Regions:
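N-terminal active-site segment of His-dependent metallophosphoesterases
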Residues: 1-49, 122
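Non-catalytic positions within long, well-ordered alpha-helices that form the structural scaffold/packing
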Residues: 28-30, 137, 176
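Active-site clefts of carbohydrate-active enzymes
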Residues: 150-161
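Active-site-proximal beta-strand elements of phosphoester/diester hydrolases
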Residues: 1-13, 110-120, 145-149
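Active-site micro-motifs of SAM-dependent methyltransferase domains
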Residues: 11, 45, 76-77, 152-153, ...
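Short, motif-level signal for alpha-helix interfacial/capping segments enriched in acidic residues
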Residues: 18-22, 159-178
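Extended active-site neighborhood of metal-dependent phosphoesterases/phosphodiesterases
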Residues: 49-140, 144, 161-165, 170-171, ...
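Active-site neighborhood of phospho(di)ester-bond hydrolases with catalytic His/Asp-centered motifs
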Residues: 5-7, 36-42, 67-74, 117, ...
Length: 214
């Protein structure tokens, strides 16, 4: 099966939300058999009523015809806690923090996908780590995928920022131990695809950073 992955469709005005909506429509045209859409976060820029209205208005013709797995981005977080939880009806896991976003998982065919909240406790709480380990260890799916907003690896300005460094140190050993096949994230506003890596060496897990064009 196929799916669409994109991120950072945020815009600060109606014109740019129209453009991001057009990108999503194009993705559907290019991949008409996609079973679902995974958005790695930052739906809006300033996280206000007007921007959310623009997002849904300009994307509704796409979103009405495909299931979306949303991720909490930092623009759904910073000083605007609670917006993400109010916008999406999700099956929230034990220990989830509705103030900063949510984390959850789902299955499709032979794949198990865990959606993480990288706004949680800069960048991720012990509760969420424990949940991820239990969640992945309880799945026997052929493909195991993680979707999150902030990245462990970056080819842009975020490469040495504290949240990226902490994410790498905190999450990489966990991801490697769980035999995750691929990690998809956003945040950097560029496209990056790594070699398969493990212990910071080229090996099993692949990391893909989506830009606004998915």
């Amino acid at each position: 099966f196929s799916f669409i992955a994109l991120a950072d469709v945020q815009a600060g005005n109606e014109i740019n939300f129209t453009k991001s909506g057009a990108v999503q429509r194009t993705a559907m045209q290019v991949c008409p058999d996609a079973k679902f859409l995974m958005n790695a976060g930052d739906f809006v820029n300033d996280c206000n009523d007007q921007e959310w209205d623009w997002f849904y208005e300009k994307s509704c013709d796409t979103l009405m015809h495909i299931t979306m797995a949303p991720t909490a981005g930092n623009h759904e977080g910073n000083l605007r806690w609670g917006w993400f939880d109010n916008m999406f009806n999700l099956d929230k896991s034990a220990g989830w923090n509705h103030i900063t976003g949510v984390y959850y998982s789902f299955d499709y065919s032979n794949a198990h996908i865990a959606v993480l909240n990288t706004n949680d406790m800069y960048p991720i709480s012990e509760e969420q780590i424990n949940w991820l380990q239990n969640d992945m260890n309880s799945s026997d799916a052929q493909w195991k995928i993680i979707l999150m907003h902030r990245a462990c690896y970056s080819a842009g300005k975020n490469i040495n920022k504290p949240d990226t460094v902490i994410m790498r140190k905190r999450l990489l050993p966990i991801i490697d131990s769980l035999d995750i096949d691929v990690v998809i994230n956003g945040h950097d506003h560029m496209y990056l695809r790594t070699y398969q890596v493990k212990d910071d060496k080229i090996q099993p897990t692949e990391y893909i950073t989506e830009n606004y064009k998915g």
